[in-house]
A protein has these predicted regions:
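Short helix/loop capping segments that flank catalytic or ligand/cofactor-binding pockets
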Residues: 29, 36, 190-193, 213-216
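Mobile "lid/hinge" segments at catalytic clefts and subdomain interfaces of large enzymes
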Residues: 165, 177, 181, 201-218
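ATP-binding N-lobe of GHMP and related small-molecule kinases
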Residues: 1-120, 131-144, 149-159, 163, ...
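A short helix-breaking turn/cap at a secondary-structure junction
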Residues: 179-197, 206
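Glycine-rich beta-alpha junction loops
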Residues: 25, 186, 208-212
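Single conserved hydrophobic/aromatic residue that forms the stacking wall/gate
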Residues: 221-224, 228-231
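FabD-like malonyl-/acyl-CoA
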Residues: 125-127
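Short glycine/proline-enriched loop/turn "hinge" motifs that connect secondary-structure elements
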Residues: 101-102, 194-200
Length: 231
């Protein structure tokens, strides 16, 4: 992982740990999770890696290998307003977690994505990867649903993306060689194993050459149009 090598070059020490959150694909159910529909999905073996080390002074200092500008803020004094950059996902995660738990320890780190940005829920992956590291250095344990809801709140309430919980659920619940089935109305879920009677298969993901951000594709307008269509 390049993030580990860059971390060692920059900080002249081994990272404390490397956090990981996979990307996800959703064969059926995309865009109906925010209308309490039933979805399925699975995680893939690519995702977000973050090499990090705790900082006892409470400072979060992260550099992305995919975006310019280093993120830096106090974990217990997150700016109230988003800043309009990639690090809003980190700030939102820290703010939502800090509303429930006392955060004292920050972290320094290098974060990287292994595929082009957009289409595989990379924003949710960044948040969950960062949350898992922030929880670890502060001695906090989140149950799976609490992790999902905290990550979702970071996007909804801080970043300003009106997403549902499909992305976060796939990334938290998914298991190798299983398909996740989730009812977003009551949050019940099932991990369906690959049948021994199935023929071998592979999942192919194609990059169109276009990168996008949910903040720039009128995602909220898309939801409004979908709701109007239902009516």
């Amino acid at each position: 992982m390049k993030c580990v090598e860059v971390y060692k070059e920059l900080y002249h020490q081994e990272p404390f740990d490397v956090a990981f959150c996979p990307y996800r694909i959703s064969p059926l159910g995309a865009h109906i999770d925010h209308q309490y529909g039933k979805i399925n999905g699975l995680a893939i073996d690519k995702g977000i890696h973050m090499a990090y080390h705790p900082k006892q002074n409470g400072v979060v200092e992260l550099q992305s290998l995919n975006f310019p500008k280093r993120a830096q803020f106090f974990v217990n004094a997150v700016p109230e307003e988003k800043q309009g950059d990639w690090a809003d996902h980190l700030r939102g995660a820290a703010k939502m977690l800090g509303e429930k738990y006392r955060l004292k320890v920050g972290l320094s780190g290098i974060i990287e994505g292994s595929l082009p940005i957009g289409g595989l829920s990379s924003s949710a992956s960044v948040i969950i990867c960062f949350l898992s590291a922030l929880c670890k250095v502060n001695g906090i344990h989140l149950e799976p649903m609490e992790m999902i809801l905290t990550a979702k709140a970071a996007e909804n309430q801080y970043v300003g993306i009106a997403c549902g919980k499909l992305d976060q659920s796939c990334e938290v619940y998914s298991k190798r060689n299983h398909l996740l089935y989730l009812d977003t109305k009551d949050d019940s879920y099932e991990l369906i194993p690959t049948s021994g009677k199935m023929k071998p298969y592979k999942v192919a993901i194609f990059f169109s050459g276009l990168e996008r951000s949910l903040k720039t594709v009128s995602y909220t307008h898309l939801r409004a149009h979908e709701t109007c269509a239902d009516l």
